[in-house]
């Protein structure tokens, strides 16, 4: 009997793909075995995260990496890092961001349920662009000049949701950010496969990239990796 049936839950046929609300993707057997082995020992979590950071950096081409409880948690941590930096006092005050740069620019057509993670960290999302392309009223989306025009002394970062149809292209956004010395956070939760995307977003200039561990990476559902700059 299925373990789910013992608690009255009915297994389903998932024809959509690794969606979080449908319990993500199926975990690889070797991952399950590794979790069983790991569960038999205690380790220093700081040492484990440092070792994981090296593994993630090697796979993504980033300077460092971090394991969190999902891509959404990674986005919250990324937003928090962009606002508080390495200041422990500011870290302790979050989500109270008074006195900090706390605005994060986001393309209006990329808004979604998961950007709540950005707001949960204490950030205010500043929307730019017109989603004409999705309403059928035109072909216009956000343009580079609109992102640049929204930058102010309160801007902490630019948030970009990776998608095949995303406009403007990520390199355009990262070029704008670099001119203004701002970090770019990329939500790439569902952008695997292809495997090349593990390194693509860092190569295109992103500073922090979040991937889901519970989709096609084949890890546990409540997992995610954040990769990017050490600082």
Each PLM stretch: what is its role?
Residues 1-22, 26, 53-67, 72-231:
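Conserved PLP-enzyme active-site core in the AAT-like
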Residues 13-51:
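A glycine-/small-polar-enriched, mobile loop at the entrance of the PLP active site in fold-type I
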């Amino acid at each position: 009997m299925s373990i789910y049936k013992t608690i009255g839950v009915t297994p389903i046929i998932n024809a959509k793909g690794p969606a979080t609300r449908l319990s993500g993707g199926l975990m690889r057997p070797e991952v399950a075995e590794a979790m069983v082995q790991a569960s038999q020992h205690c380790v220093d979590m700081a040492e484990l995260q440092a070792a994981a950071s090296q593994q993630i950096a090697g796979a993504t081409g980033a300077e460092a990496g971090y394991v969190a409880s999902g891509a959404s948690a990674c986005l919250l941590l990324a937003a928090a890092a962009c606002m508080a930096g390495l200041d422990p006092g500011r870290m302790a005050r979050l989500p109270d961001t008074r006195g900090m740069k706390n605005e994060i620019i986001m393309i209006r057509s990329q808004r979604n349920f998961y950007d709540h993670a950005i707001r949960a960290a204490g950030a205010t999302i500043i929307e730019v662009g017109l989603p004409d392309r999705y309403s059928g009223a035109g072909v216009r989306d956000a343009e580079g000049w609109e992102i640049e025009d929204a930058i102010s002394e309160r801007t902490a970062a630019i948030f970009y949701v990776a998608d095949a149809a995303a406009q403007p292209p990520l390199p355009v956004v990262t070029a704008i950010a670099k001119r203004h010395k701002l970090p770019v956070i990329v939500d790439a939760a569902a952008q695997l496969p292809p495997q090349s995307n593990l390194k693509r977003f860092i190569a295109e200039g992103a500073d922090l990239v979040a991937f889901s561990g519970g989709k096609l990476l084949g890890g546990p559902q409540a997992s995610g990796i954040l990769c990017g700059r050490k600082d």
